């Protein structure tokens, strides 16, 4: 499936890679993994693409692999207005979270919040 990689390499157009679900949701997948993904994400073409998308859309979400796995999230954090860390309850270790914060801060990314997922919902313990 074609996506961001093909768009940045000028093999496909925006219309060819964009999946228009409704008037409020458009998704562009990563596409085929290039030989140098971090370089491609750090490129001027990626910066220009994000700038164009900011003119077209109100919100842009860049879903990346975990910070501990590859540098993609760290690279893209410098191009984003903010970073949301996603942490799984009962699974993600505190040291991994602290290391992730450090990695984002090293490149001057802006952490705007944390999403805690995988939390068990207990109906009887619900309160404000």
Where are the regions a protein language model picked out?
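P-loop NTP-binding module
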Residues: 1-128
């Amino acid at each position: 499936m074609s996506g961001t990689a093909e768009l940045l390499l000028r093999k496909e157009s925006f219309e060819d890679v964009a999946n228009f679900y409704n008037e409020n949701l458009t998704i562009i997948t990563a596409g085929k993994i290039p030989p140098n993904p971090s370089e491609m994400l750090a490129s001027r073409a990626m910066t220009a693409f994000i700038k164009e998308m900011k003119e077209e859309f109100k919100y842009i979400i860049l879903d990346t692999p975990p910070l501990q796995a590859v540098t993609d999230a760290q690279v893209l954090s410098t191009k984003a207005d903010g970073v949301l860390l996603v942490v799984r309850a009962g699974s993600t270790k505190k040291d991994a979270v602290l290391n992730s914060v450090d990695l984002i801060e090293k490149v001057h990314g802006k952490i705007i919040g944390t999403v805690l997922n995988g939390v068990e919902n207990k109906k009887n313990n619900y309160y404000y």
